[in-house]
């Protein structure tokens, strides 16, 4: 790819449920299918997109590893399509720089992929109990932990780490770009408006007003202090000039995992908190997951 553009506001708000979006006809390297799944837990329909690899339609009996790729705050299930990320993935497939696997992007609003503070929006329960089983039944996903990964960007990075650290028995690998990790919560007071602005980006999933105790209970860094993560492959990176200071949180997670002698891959790269940074490092995250799949799956490519 010569250019990855940042999504326009109107594109961020697009959400076509039940439609099928095809890759450009001139490039038969895969396609994206955007559909929806009814949820009893959330009492609504949830839209999602699946990037199907080049061989999916031709090889009718073949099954594939699956990567759940979670979007950031303010985005939606079509973020890879309207940002140019789908073209990036297709380039990797076309140039044989990435093996084939399913990439699934569910819509999550501002949920942070957790069960909300008020208990009314149980997104984590939905994801594990309804979404994963539904998607893996509809599409030809290889069964079992060894063929399943989860990753995300910003809020999605938080969600991926949160879910994988709480349920490591379900995933072979987890990855995150610029995950919404906060090293130390600021003093919450009306006078501390500058620090409070960092909390507003978290939305109301953690309570309104913000509940520090609930945050700590769900914080991936807190969970990682005691979680049994043996066998889970871990990758995360962050820009050294992250606009929200999430680089400090990423460094704290790196320090914690190192102190526990938990193998992981962490990178602090030059850059901020934007699509340009994510696009530059997305290939490395995808390749990380494919290498994990390749080491465990019968036929990963």
Where are these regions (language model features)?
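Positively charged n-region of N-terminal signal peptides that target proteins for export
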Residues: 1-6
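Non-catalytic cap/lid and distal C-terminal segments of serine-dependent acyl enzymes
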Residues: 27-301
């Amino acid at each position: 790819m010569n250019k990855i553009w940042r999504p326009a506001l109107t594109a961020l708000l697009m959400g076509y449920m039940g439609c099928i979006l095809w890759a450009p006809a001139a490039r038969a390297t895969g396609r994206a299918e955007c559909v929806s799944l009814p949820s009893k837990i959330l009492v609504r329909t949830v839209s999602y997109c699946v990037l199907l690899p080049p061989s999916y339609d031709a090889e009718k009996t073949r099954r594939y590893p699956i990567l759940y790729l979670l979007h950031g705050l303010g985005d939606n299930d079509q973020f890879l399509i309207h940002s140019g990320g789908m073209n990036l993935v297709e380039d990797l497939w076309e140039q044989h720089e990435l093996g084939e696997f399913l990439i699934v992007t569910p819509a999550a609003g501002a949920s942070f992929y957790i069960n909300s503070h008020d208990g009314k929006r149980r997104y984590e329960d939905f994801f594990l109990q309804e979404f994963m089983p539904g998607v893996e039944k509809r599409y030809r996903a290889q069964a079992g932990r060894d063929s399943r990964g989860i990753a995300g960007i910003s809020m999605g990075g938080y969600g991926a780490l949160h879910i994988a650290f709480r349920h490591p028995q379900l995933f072979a690998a987890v990855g995150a770009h610029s995950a919404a990790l906060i090293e130390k919560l600021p003093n919450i007071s009306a006078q501390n408006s500058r620090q409070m602005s960092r909390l507003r980006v978290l939305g109301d999933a953690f309570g309104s007003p913000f509940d520090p105790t609930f945050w700590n209970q769900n914080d991936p860094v807190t969970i990682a202090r005691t979680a049994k993560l043996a066998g889970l492959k871990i990758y995360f990176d962050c820009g050294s000039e992250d606009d929200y200071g999430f680089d400090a949180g990423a460094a704290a997670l790196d320090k914690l995992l190192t102190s526990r002698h938990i193998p992981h891959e962490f990178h602090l790269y030059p850059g901020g908190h934007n699509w340009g940074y994510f696009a530059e490092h997305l290939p490395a995250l995808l390749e990380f997951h494919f290498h994990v799949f390749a080491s465990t799956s019968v036929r990963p490519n």
